[in-house]
Amino acid sequence: MATRRGDTLIFPKPPVIAAHACIGGKKEGESPLAAEFDELHSDNRLGQASWEAAETQLQLQTARLCLKKAHATEKDVSLLLAGDLQAQCTASGYAARALGLPFAGLFGACSTMAEALGVGACLCSAGMADGLLAMTCLLYTSDAADDM
């Protein structure tokens, strides 16, 4: 069980981040951080009919790239911790279904990734999960912003 030192949790068996992946869209490609992305798409819709479907595809591509970089498969994942800025975690739910993974939706807005890493660390340290996939998604686009 973790112990506390002030506001910090100390895990007897510290969790490990086995891999990470980051895929962005057009705006990310124009940013000063563009070189930090694994892949960039020039089409924010990723060929999809809606931006919800595009975010689902972005999450799927990123999850699969992360698993590949970790030399893992979906079978190595006990739980997917994910969220997005859509009502009811729409893109995350569809991505989880396509990956065939148990899913816990997180609603932290901009803090979703930090929330997923913190909750995931606690679950792994407590022996409740062996392999976790943590992800979040926000494409800088919507029907109103497609021409930006």
Language-model region placement:
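Acidic, glycine-rich active-site loops and adjacent beta-strand->loop/helix elements
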Residues: G83-Q88, C110-S111, T136-L139
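Active-site-proximal alpha-helical scaffold in enzymes
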Residues: F107-A134
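A short, terminal or domain-edge coil/loop segment
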Residues: K27, E36-L40, M128-L139
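Conserved "HGTGT" condensation-loop signature of ketosynthase/thiolase-family condensing enzymes
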Residues: M1-L81, L85-A104
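Single conserved hydrophobic/aromatic residue that forms the stacking wall/gate
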Residues: Y140-M148
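Glycine-/small-residue-rich "gating" segment that lines the acyl/pantetheine channel
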Residues: A2, G6, A114-G118, S142
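Residues within alpha-helical segments
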Residues: L60-L67, L117, A121, D146
